[in-house]
Amino acid sequence: MENFKTDFAKTLKESNLSEKEIAFKNLNAKEFSKQGFPNRKDEDWKFSDINQIIKKEIGELKFYTGQSKETDIDEDVLLGEIKHNKLIFVNGQLVQTDFSSEEISKIEFLDNKNDTEDQSVENSLINLNNALANKSYKLLVKKNYQIKNPLIIYHVSNNKVTSQNINLKINFELEENSSLKLIDLLKDKGNKNFINIFYNFSLEKNSVLKNYKIDQFENDNIRYMFNNIKQSSNSVSETFYLSKGSTFSKNEIFCDLKGEHSSAFVNGVFSLNKNKHHEIKAKINHLVENTKSYQSVSYTHLTLPTNREV
């Protein structure tokens, strides 16, 4: 944990943040230092001791990233078969955005929004993300607009990073009667890194979100992805996982169905060999009447059972 404290201090020193932003990051760093990485004593991690997995697979983890210059885009990772919008992250840094096929007045993408909430959360990996992510991004889809083409977020790591903690946070807001088809495409050449991704979704009345997470390509990384979803009336969220490539992957969904006739669906296909561990944990809270949820996960090859709860 001393390594984290040293790297956090270095990160904070090199950042240009307001007092409120610094206080927010200090609060989350303190919480992470207190809790550390989750282990089997935590009920939510009884199937996967990520603390021991990181020690075994990575060893000493580096938390300081700085602004790497090694963020060139390998054109081979880009999909040419379908027309799509793009956000390209290389080693956790945003290197390209492209919404040229959309009505630009109907969407907003902010790449300089830092969170300043003063509350902490009971999830040490979210604390870690809040402490070290250099900024949090926001995508707004405005009222009555359906994004024409899917948004593919390319999560790329290259062979310039190893034993590195990479953190990314994006907030998505779908206003009334809007829709978004979002594809997370994981393409890693960097190995033995811990990649920590946190998404916040706010779905207003009659909005529709479809999120496809594709972890297809073989890599030695350890990955944690958390979707926090808040849904108003008549909104729909659907999350689909193709989970295969990473050495270890845990995907969590925490969803509040706050409005009547809102619904949430989680589907997944896991194709793993006996040396990999992938897990989904979905908690969907039905806070009002007349809401609906459904979960279905199928496995091939030898793996541990899914941990699911409603």
PLM-predicted stretches and their roles:
Residues 1-168, 173, 177-179, 186:
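N-terminal leader/transition segments
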Residues 103, 110, 115-302, 308:
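Conserved beta-strand/loop scaffold segments within soluble protein domains that form the structured core
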